[in-house]
Amino acid sequence: TSDTLRQLREEHPDDELWLLMGTDMFLTLQHWHEPEKILSLAGIAAFGRTEADTEELFSVQRDYLYRTYPQAQIFTMTIPGVMDISSTELREQLAQKGGSKWLAPAVYGYILREHLYQTHVDLRHLPLSQLRPVALSYLKYKRIPHVLGTEQEAIRLAERYGADVQKARVAALLHDCTKKLNMEEQLALCKRYGIELDELEKEALKLLHAKTGAAIARDVFGVDEEIYQAIWWHTTGHAGMTALEKVMYLADYIEPSRDFPGVEELRHVCYEDLDKGLLMGLEMTIQEMTAMGNPVHRATIEARDALKG
């Protein structure tokens, strides 16, 4: 543990590290290898493994650690309704294709994605029940409701307009898989996958995640060309969009957590007429970008003009 924390400190010198542990580990911390080093590198956040593990139990050990290791940072908590499972039991369940009920979806997804704890899933042939948590593991926490909302909106739109519901769900789950990356990381992916960029895209971070996300979706998850294109065009749109591309563009635009002037009217129009909804969404985007003094991508202009005839 001390070696791991030392490495993490070198990799993340500006971050504050905390080591989470249950009651049994907390009560024996002084017997670990290099406890003083551990406590100098990270704070300790200990939680009760059962409801019987009260503050009274924690306080004696906490006071001892403070006396013995003055530099220690310790936070203890009790969790109502806690379920008792050991890390050993959880690892065993994961190796047997179980364990998901004990973990936050994004955490479970990260374990599957990185093949940790003897999990051996084929990322290119995941059922939706596993693709969803893996997709969520790519996101910042605050973006998770948006992606889940986009999936649900994509289902409704696909059912309404006869697009492939399964493909709409996959595209929705993966459409923002590279959204959290910075410009340097986005450009590195573009270089890796041979993605050619125009002058606007080279400067507009918001536009890049659609293309790099499509590349990751195809390379890592093995999506087909229809899903690839739906992710590729979900930010700008383009002339002659397929039904799936339209569904993806609009699901991203009007999903339930979106809240901006005109969104309710746009939602109404989208379910009255798909093309009218798409045209309205494109025009709203163009108006917003123009009002902000930002350039509008030519693909968006071409998509609008094609719909207007």
Regions found by a protein language model. Give the residues of each.
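N-terminal polybasic phosphate/anion-binding patch
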Residues: 129, 139
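Divalent metal-dependent catalytic cores for phosphoryl transfer on phosphate-bearing substrates
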Residues: 133-137, 146, 155-282
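Metal-dependent nucleotide-binding catalytic modules
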Residues: 264-309
